[in-house]
């Protein structure tokens, strides 16, 4: 596993939970002897939904809601078998989506 790299992408609606999860992953990887690059903040994805306030007419009266998806990227360079094992056992909050590429 000498020249391999693990790329972890984290997504969440709440940036505080996302940053805590990223810190847990970085701390766990460093403790097991791997070199870590990140967490790198990626652009926040903003989705806006516009709805009419009234049911029948008054099209000028609208309301907008937005959903922000925050993202972070972590690269683990030269992971050891102990690193992979400790990352598999790591417990993260349910609001964080994790994508792992080897």
Curated annotation (Swiss-Prot):
The keyword Ribosomal protein applies. Keywords: Ribonucleoprotein, Ribosomal protein. Part of the 30S ribosomal subunit. InterPro entries: Ribosomal_uS10, Ribosomal_uS10_CS, Ribosomal_uS10_dom, Ribosomal_uS10_dom_sf. The gene is rpsJ. Belongs to the universal ribosomal protein uS10 family. Pfam families: Ribosomal_S10 (PF00338). One of its GO terms (biological process) is translation. PROSITE patterns: RIBOSOMAL_S10. This is Small ribosomal subunit protein uS10. It comes from Bacillus mycoides (strain KBAB4). One of its GO terms (molecular function) is tRNA binding. One of its GO terms (cellular component) is ribonucleoprotein complex.
């Amino acid at each position: 596993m000498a020249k391999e790299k693990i790329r972890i992408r984290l997504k969440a609606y709440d940036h505080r939970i996302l940053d805590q999860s990223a810190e847990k992953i970085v701390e766990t990887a460093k403790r097991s002897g791997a070199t870590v690059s990140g967490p790198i903040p990626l652009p926040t994805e903003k989705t806006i939904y516009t709805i009419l306030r009234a049911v029948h007419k008054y099209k000028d009266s609208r309301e907008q809601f937005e959903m922000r998806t925050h993202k972070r990227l972590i690269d683990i360079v030269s992971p050891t078998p102990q690193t992979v094992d400790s990352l598999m056992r790591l417990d993260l909050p349910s609001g964080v989506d994790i994508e792992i590429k080897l």
